[in-house]
Amino acid sequence: MSVLTPLLLRGLTGSARRLPVPCARVHSKPPREQLGTMDIAIGLTSCFVCFLLPSGWVLSHLENYKKRE
């Protein structure tokens, strides 16, 4: 890298620092109905069964997939 590289990079990013960043104003309504403990438990269980269980099975049988038969 040359000696001028940091100066060039600072010159390119210097103008971007002065630009204003718009602030998003996001508002939402309160939920129509509160989630209960059972709803949350069912949701977490279904996520576990759908995503983590198959990937865990594949990872535990990875050595079997590496073998050529």
Swiss-Prot record:
Pathway: Energy metabolism; oxidative phosphorylation. Keywords: Membrane, Mitochondrion, Mitochondrion inner membrane, Transit peptide, Transmembrane, Transmembrane helix, Ubl conjugation. It comes from Otolemur crassicaudatus. Residues 61-69 are mitochondrial intermembrane. It holds the Pfam family COX8. CDD domains: Cyt_c_Oxidase_VIII. The gene is COX8A. The chain crosses the membrane at residues 37-60. Residues 26-36 are mitochondrial matrix. It is found in: Mitochondrion inner membrane. Component of the cytochrome c oxidase, the last enzyme in the mitochondrial electron transport chain which drives oxidative phosphorylation. The respiratory chain contains 3 multisubunit complexes succinate dehydrogenase (complex II, CII), ubiquinol-cytochrome c oxidoreductase (cytochrome b-c1 complex, complex III, CIII) and cytochrome c oxidase (complex IV, CIV), that cooperate to transfer electrons derived from NADH and succinate to molecular oxygen, creating an electrochemical gradient over the inner membrane that drives transmembrane transport and the ATP synthase. Its main location: mitochondrion. SUPFAM superfamilies: Mitochondrial cytochrome c oxidase subunit VIIIb (aka IX). It is a single-pass membrane protein. Component of the cytochrome c oxidase (complex IV, CIV), a multisubunit enzyme composed of 14 subunits. The complex is composed of a catalytic core of 3 subunits MT-CO1, MT-CO2 and MT-CO3, encoded in the mitochondrial DNA, and 11 supernumerary subunits COX4I, COX5A, COX5B, COX6A, COX6B, COX6C, COX7A, COX7B, COX7C, COX8 and NDUFA4, which are encoded in the nuclear genome. InterPro entries: Cyt_c_oxidase_su8 (IPR003205), Cyt_c_oxidase_su8_sf (IPR036548). This is Cytochrome c oxidase subunit 8A, mitochondrial. Residues 1-25 form a transit peptide. GO terms for cellular component: mitochondrial inner membrane; respiratory chain complex IV. In response to mitochondrial stress, the precursor protein is ubiquitinated by the SIFI complex in the cytoplasm before mitochondrial import, leading to its degradation. Within the SIFI complex, UBR4 initiates ubiquitin chain that are further elongated or branched by KCMF1. A motif (SIFI-degron) lies at residues 2-19. GO terms for biological process: mitochondrial electron transport, cytochrome c to oxygen. The keyword Mitochondrion applies. Coiled coil: none annotated. Belongs to the cytochrome c oxidase VIII family.
